[in-house]
Every structure is written in structure tokens, then in C-alpha cells.
Amino acid sequence: MVYENPDGIRIGLEIHVQLNKLKTKMFCGCSTDYHNAAPNTHTCPVCLGLPGALPVLNKKAVEAAIKVGLALEGEIAEETQFHRKNYFYPDLPKGFQVTQYDYPIVSKGKVVIEGEDGEHVVGITRAHMEEDPGKLVHIGSIEKSKGVLIDYNRSGMPLIETVTEPDMRSPKEARRFLDKFRNILEYLDVFDGNLEGAMRVDANVSVHWGTRVEVKNISSHKGVERALLYEIMRQKNVIRRGGKITQETRHFDEGRGVTISMRTKEEAEDYRYFREPDLMPMRVTGWIPAIKETLPELPDAKRARFMEQYGITDMHARALTSKIMLADFYEGVCAKGVDPKVAATWTADVLLGELNYRDLAISSYDGRTIGFIHAKDPEVENSFKVSDMVELVTLFAEGKVSDRAAVEVIRTILDGNEEKSPSQIIEEKGLFKAEDDLVTRAVAETIAENEAAVQDYLGGTEKSLNFLVGQVMKKTKGTADAKTARELIVKELKG
């Protein structure tokens, strides 16, 4: 099926990614580890823009940019150079930003996503290096603030800005692109997406193939999707009333879920770009072969290998490779000799599902334990051991625990009981699978006590069977196997 795109929606993204895995900033020796530091303590004359301070390029940042370009299947420039982008704003103490203009380090890449009609290619126009400005802290909301504080700890942080073609046709495709793009960056180990401000997105969107509007500085993938949904609705309403869309820059108010006009959209000439005289042009083609050798197995290749090596479904392979540390955890479990298909089910469906429900983000994996932090409160930490998943998968495969009991074990561990093994939890909670005679007795009692549901089922109401199974599970405190309970009920009622 071909997606017709009835509203003529075109979405392009500009993604600003901090290379926060590097030790020092883009053009000076200040540490990039500033997130728990007091304001304006990770600064120097270079990142404060003091007169006479000269930049020194961080070679590791260039290598990271090349690595990103190769992973995006882009062309690496034979020669690249920096420019000054001139504008006056409090977060930019020099009065200009050191960036790249007509000689970006990467061009003509692509990312393949799951689109509205199957696989969909999103073109990468360019990816270029630049420095991050400082951070403005508004007192109150951005609209009503009576004062602004400035923290220059972020000033000079190494950034890669990646610009896509307007190839996305819905907010859902835009979010899927961001998920895939972030996944690639995490596999490359160039940034930590759990840190504040690690990725910021500007979204350009138009409807009916018309004038585009830019929505600036969105900090989450969900926020991008929400902002685009609102902005598309707003533009369609303007056109429906006979109005015209103005090319402008808007801000997304996360709390209210609306976009707010900030200013008319600037053109490139408004920034008066000119070459940075304090940094020489670079020829980097000689670096490429060595950097290419360091590229890891990327998400698509790992997904294909998981399906072939472990015999798991495409859905499970996609979920498991959506985070590199989750993929490593799964392989750690499989290395212990358990059934990889059962391990995939419990890791991708249950463990990952619980993490999403609890708003926990994967933060570490050391070969033995996978760690999590709460997305909104990094002080909340949790973990899950490889050995615990191996034990749980083994108990389930041997028929010693039901699926409901296994889910209860995972939830109990994530509730802060990492020190207890699955067997201990099962013993304490009485979760070992019920004996057949106990299940048979529970089935008989359930049928006797629920005559109305029995008659509904016999009359063709299939959902009544689910109710009866639930009653059996309740009587056995979740220790019965749901499939066995269902089969026994059907056999008892229909012979």
C-alpha cells in the first residue's frame, strides 16, 4: 500500500546533538562534564568569548563527526572548514557562533525507517560541526519571564547538527526517525542521551506543499510529535479560514501543547557568514579508513543477525536492538545457554514493557547487570542481573512457573528487590506453578460459582471464557498456567 499523504505534509528536522562522551569542549580544554556543576564553573576565556582568546580544535570531535557520517552512509568532505555565524543573543558571548556553512563535513546520507507504508528512506542533507551556545534560564515561563539567568557551562560544547530532507510525511514518521537516529548515535558511543540537553530538535513543517514553519528547540521525541501534530492542525485551520501561512519561527509550549510565534524566519544572509580566520581548513580523507575500522555493528545489521542467529521474530529483534545496552544484555543472557526465543520474549516484551511503563531509561551495562534511571528523576536508580533473567527463563522453560508468576518476579525485582533471586521471590510469594489437581479443582469451583458466565460462553460469547480463566488464575493466585486453565475449562464445558 502506498501512502497518499492527503494533506501534503512535508517535515524536515534539524537535530542538534551534543558529543557529551568527549572529555573536553569543541575549541578549548574545559570539561564537558558540567551537568551537576555550579553555573559558570566550567568556563575559560575561549568559551566566554574574551578578547584575544584563540580556539584550538578538538580532534576527537572531528573523528566523532566522521564516524556519524559513515554510519549515516554519507559523503565525507575531502576538505572542510569553519565559519562564523553572526548574531547577537545573550547566550553567545562572542557575538558569533563557530559553525560550518558551505563546507560541511558530511553530506548526502540516509536513514531507513518504518514509514506509513513500509520501509521509508529519509535523506540526510548535511551534518556539520559547531559549538553549543550557553543556556538561558527564564524566571517563570518564556512568555512572562521578568528576568533571564545565563549559564555558560554549556558554551563551547561540541555539537553535530544533522539536517534532513523534508521526507517525513507525518509526526509519527518524524518520531520514528528520531528514535532510529538516536539509536545509531548510541551505538557509535558518541553521546549519552540520558543527559539534559543532549539532543535538541528544530522541526520544519508545511501542509499542502506550502510555506514551511520552524518550531525551535524541542527537547524530546514525544515533544516533537506533539508539536508537529498541533502545528499541522494550526496550519490547516489557517488555510481553511482563507488565511496564508507566514514563514516564521515558533516555540513549543510543552505544558499547553501549543506552538507560539517567536519571530519571522531568518534567511542565511541574515547571519553574515564568513570563514573563521582562527581555524585552518582541514583535509580529513586520510583519517577515514582508520575510523571506518572502529565502526561497531549498527542497529540494522544487529537486528538481521539476531533474527538469523537466534531465530527470533523481526518484532523482537527490533525491540532488542532499539538500545545497544539492551541488545548486549540479551546476548549476555543467551550466552548462558537458555532458549533465545524465550529470552527474547521476556526481555523484549516484559522487561522492556515494564521499563516503559515505569518511565525508566537504560543507563548502563557492565556485562553482568543492566542499570536504569528514571527519565524525570535521575536520582532514582534500579538494575536487573543477567543471572536473574537466565534463572527466570530457565524456570519458565521447565514449566515451574506460570507466565503471570514470571511477570510478577520481574516487577518485584524492579520494585527495588535486586538483591533477591527469582527463586527467593517465587518461594516467598508462593508463585511456583500450581499442581494439576489444584488447577483442576479451581476449574471445577469456577464453573460451579459462575453459572451466568458459563451459559454466556456456551451461547457463543467468547469473552466469557476469558472471565472464567481469570477466575481460575485468581483462585490459584496466578500460579496456574493460563493456557492449561483455558483448555481444562473448554474440555469440561464442551467435552
UniProtKB/Swiss-Prot annotation:
PROSITE patterns: GATB (PS01234). GO terms for molecular function: asparaginyl-tRNA synthase (glutamine-hydrolyzing) activity; ATP binding; glutaminyl-tRNA synthase (glutamine-hydrolyzing) activity. Allows the formation of correctly charged Asn-tRNA(Asn) or Gln-tRNA(Gln) through the transamidation of misacylated Asp-tRNA(Asn) or Glu-tRNA(Gln) in organisms which lack either or both of asparaginyl-tRNA or glutaminyl-tRNA synthetases. The reaction takes place in the presence of glutamine and ATP through an activated phospho-Asp-tRNA(Asn) or phospho-Glu-tRNA(Gln). This is Aspartyl/glutamyl-tRNA(Asn/Gln) amidotransferase subunit B. It comes from the Archaea. It catalyses: L-glutamyl-tRNA(Gln) + L-glutamine + ATP + H2O = L-glutaminyl-tRNA(Gln) + L-glutamate + ADP + phosphate + H(+); L-aspartyl-tRNA(Asn) + L-glutamine + ATP + H2O = L-asparaginyl-tRNA(Asn) + L-glutamate + ADP + phosphate + 2 H(+). Its EC number is 6.3.5.-. InterPro entries: Asn/Gln-tRNA_amidoTrfase_suB/E (IPR017959), Asn/Gln-tRNA_Trfase_suB/E_cat (IPR006075), Asn/Gln_amidotransferase (IPR018027), Asn/Gln_tRNA_amidoTrase-B-like (IPR003789), GatB (IPR004413), GatB_C_1 (IPR042114), GatB_Yqey_C_2 (IPR023168), Gln-tRNA_amidoTrfase_suB_CS (IPR017958). GO terms for biological process: glutaminyl-tRNAGln biosynthesis via transamidation; translation. Keywords: ATP-binding, Ligase, Nucleotide-binding, Protein biosynthesis. The keyword Nucleotidyltransferase does not apply. Pfam families: GatB_N, GatB_Yqey. Heterotrimer of A, B and C subunits. Belongs to the GatB/GatE family. GatB subfamily. SMART domains: GatB_Yqey (SM00845).
